[in-house]
Amino acid sequence: MDSIKVQQNIKTIGQMKANGVFENYIEYIDFPFYKNLIPHSKITFEFPLTVLVGKNGGGKSSTLHALFGAPKGYTCSDFWFSTDVDPIADGGDRPRYFYGYKTDKNSEIKEVMKTRIRRGGTKTKKEDPDYWETSRPLKKDGMAEKRRYTPVEKDVVYLDFRAEVSAFDKILH
């Protein structure tokens, strides 16, 4: 693909975002206290394609896991959970992140906080120390003081090529 075609595609995608083609679009994600990320790290998704690059341990996978867990019905606990060997130390604060999304071009931004809590066991549900749920907006984290919104409704496809490509293929192909 030549560079002119690439530039045309980028312009077209930018116009699509400006015209509101992408519904339930996550505009940004903020990490007040999440894994090894610097507190209040924020990513703004100004364009519908974002590339995360950086050294090992820089938080790329952690960011993707949070984005995976953002929509309704999904959780980052599929990837981040406490074990006896690798416990999650909260340092006196609950791991959490929030994001803002628009349902359509003209809607206001709705902010959703996701917080890791320890859910106690009940008759119908077992105890879960790695349970993530939405919580009320927290002014101390820089959220707009509005109401508690439901998570964005989106289908998620998570591809992790480390799990898809074998070591043999990585080395010999």
Give names to the regions the model predicted.
Residues 1-172:
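P-loop NTPase switch/coupling surface
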